[in-house]
């Protein structure tokens, strides 16, 4: 495992962030303003965005990429880099964003139409200098989380999607992802990078608030094993930067939100992540930070993130 340490000890740290217009809409904020502020005020130059199928293809084979066009164009203006999540299972609840016209319980049809969506997306943006990488699906083989028919989430479908992206845009790396609480990814197709999520303090209806027991050193060893076994590079695709409470964050008071996320907890999470020697990490929570600052009079999370990104 010393090879893993030596391989990465001189790597430049990259702190990126995920951004979802769907989540911004839940908070009732202007997602375009929030996205621009994430670029300009927070100073992020690595952003993960997603293709929301139900917003892009509201009618069969009629595509509206205006939202993603805006994000790509604004990133280009600033020399920012985007990781674009493509597929049927992407970021934010309910994970799978099937259009109303699609029979989501027909795995063959879903697989075919997913590949058509991926093809349209990759061909549209592969010539943009803002696109750094493609993430194919999001924690795709985690079948216990999200409102997705389990029969659609197969290795065969995933492998086909990866091959589609690789054929259309062979020059860019592809990333797969997994929840950190779900073992080691010994099965499944290989890609150039592999991301796992990292959450620290969460809530469920059985235990209430609790801290995940995995240590930073545990994740160092896990990352080393993944890189060795799968011949890939490991990233943290979701580092907890927002509250995980008993209700949606738009319904949590600031007092309750701080039970799982606060400025101190954010700094602690970054320290924890750095113990792994994984140098590329994407924070989770940009829409919440903006909502707190703009509508709740609570700029503390926003300012903490700004200071960390500027380090």
Which residues does each PLM region occupy?
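Hydrophobic faces of well-ordered beta-strands that scaffold small-molecule active sites
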Residues: 13-19, 47-49, 82-86, 132-136, ...
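Substrate-binding cleft of secreted/luminal carbohydrate-active enzymes
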Residues: 233-310
């Amino acid at each position: 495992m010393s090879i893993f340490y030596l391989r990465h000890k001189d790597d430049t740290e990259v702190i990126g962030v995920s951004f979802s217009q769907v989540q911004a809409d839940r908070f009732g904020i202007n997602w375009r303003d929030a996205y621009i502020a994430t670029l300009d005020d927070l100073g992020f130059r690595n952003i993960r965005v997603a293709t929301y199928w139900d917003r892009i293809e509201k009618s069969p084979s009629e595509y509206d990429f205006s939202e993603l066009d805006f994000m790509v164009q604004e990133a280009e203006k600033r020399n920012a880099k985007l990781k674009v999540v493509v597929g049927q299972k992407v970021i934010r609840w309910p994970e799978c964003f099937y259009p109303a016209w699609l029979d989501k319980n027909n795995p063959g049809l879903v697989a075919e139409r997913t590949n058509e969506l991926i093809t349209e997306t990759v061909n549209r943006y592969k010539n943009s200098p803002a696109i750094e990488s493609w993430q194919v699906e999001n924690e795709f083989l985690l079948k216990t989380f999200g409102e997705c028919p389990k029969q659609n989430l197969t290795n065969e479908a995933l492998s086909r999607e990866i091959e589609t992206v690789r054929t259309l845009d062979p020059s860019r790396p592809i990333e797969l992802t997994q929840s950190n609480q779900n073992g080691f990814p010994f099965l499944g197709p290989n890609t150039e990078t592999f991301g796992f999520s990292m959450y620290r303090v969460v809530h469920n209806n059985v235990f209430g608030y609790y801290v995940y027991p995995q240590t930073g050193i545990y994740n160092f060893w896990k990352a080393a094993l993944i890189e060795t076994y799968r011949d890939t590079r490991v990233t943290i695709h979701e580092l907890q930067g927002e509250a995980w409470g008993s209700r949606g964050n738009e319904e949590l008071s600031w007092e309750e939100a701080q039970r799982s996320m606060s400025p101190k907890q954010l700094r602690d999470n970054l320290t924890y992540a750095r113990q792994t020697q994984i140098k590329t990490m994407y924070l989770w929570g940009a829409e919440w930070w903006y909502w707190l600052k703009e509508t709740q009079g609570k700029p503390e999370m926003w300012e903490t993130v700004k200071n960390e990104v500027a380090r």
